[in-house]
Structures are given as C-alpha cells and as structure tokens.
C-alpha cells in the first residue's frame, strides 16, 4: 500500500471519516481533527511508518490537510 492510501486508511480508522475526496481540505476546519485527534494521528503514523514526527515539525498549518500529511510522512520516511 502506498503512503497516500495508508494515510487515508489511518484517518478513516481513527476518525471514521473518508478523506479521499477532500485531500486539500483543512481537516481541523472540517471537524476531522482536533488536538487529541492530532496526538492519536501522530502516534499511529509513527507506528505504521516507523518514523518519528518531531513536535517542531508538526505545525497545524504544515499538516492540516491529508495531502500535507502524506507529504510530511514521505519526507520523514526519506530522511
């Protein structure tokens, strides 16, 4: 499974929300993510992709859409 498909699956599993049709929509504004959800998402991303997301790199504006999450995970996997 590619990064995009897996990120979509993780968001769906955690938040019961299919974001495949809203990849560029702000997930906070859409009510998908909140502060607790963000923590859950980071933990799951770290476990599934064997990455570490530094707090300094997880700004809301940098990871607020599914596409930005995919980009962030991809960058951390390639680091």
Curated annotation (Swiss-Prot):
Modified positions (O-(pantetheine 4'-phosphoryl)serine) are: 35
Chief location of this protein within or outside the cell:
cytoplasm
Q: GO annotations under biological process?
A: cell wall organization; lipoteichoic acid biosynthetic process
Q: Does the keyword RNA-binding apply?
A: no
Q: Where does this protein act, in terms of pathway?
A: Cell wall biogenesis; lipoteichoic acid biosynthesis
Ranges for domain Carrier: 1-77
Give the matching InterPro entries: ACP-like_sf, DltC, PP-bd_ACP
Q: Which GO terms describe its molecular function?
A: D-alanyl carrier activity
Sorted alphabetically, the Gene Ontology cellular component annotations on this record are:
cytoplasm
Q: Does the keyword RNA-binding apply?
A: no
Q: Indicate where this protein resides in the cell.
A: Cytoplasm
What keywords is this UniProt entry annotated with? Cell wall biogenesis/degradation, Cytoplasm, Phosphopantetheine, Phosphoprotein
PTM remark = 4'-phosphopantetheine is transferred from CoA to a specific serine of apo-DCP.
What role does it play? Carrier protein involved in the D-alanylation of lipoteichoic acid (LTA). The loading of thioester-linked D-alanine onto DltC is catalyzed by D-alanine--D-alanyl carrier protein ligase DltA. The DltC-carried D-alanyl group is further transferred to cell membrane phosphatidylglycerol (PG) by forming an ester bond, probably catalyzed by DltD. D-alanylation of LTA plays an important role in modulating the properties of the cell wall in Gram-positive bacteria, influencing the net charge of the cell wall.
Query: What protein family does this chain belong to?
Result: Belongs to the DltC family.
Could you identify this protein by its name? D-alanyl carrier protein
Q: Which organism is it from?
A: Streptococcus gordonii (strain Challis / ATCC 35105 / BCRC 15272 / CH1 / DL1 / V288)
Classification of source organism: Bacteria, Bacillati, Bacillota, Bacilli, Lactobacillales
Q: Which gene encodes it?
A: dltC
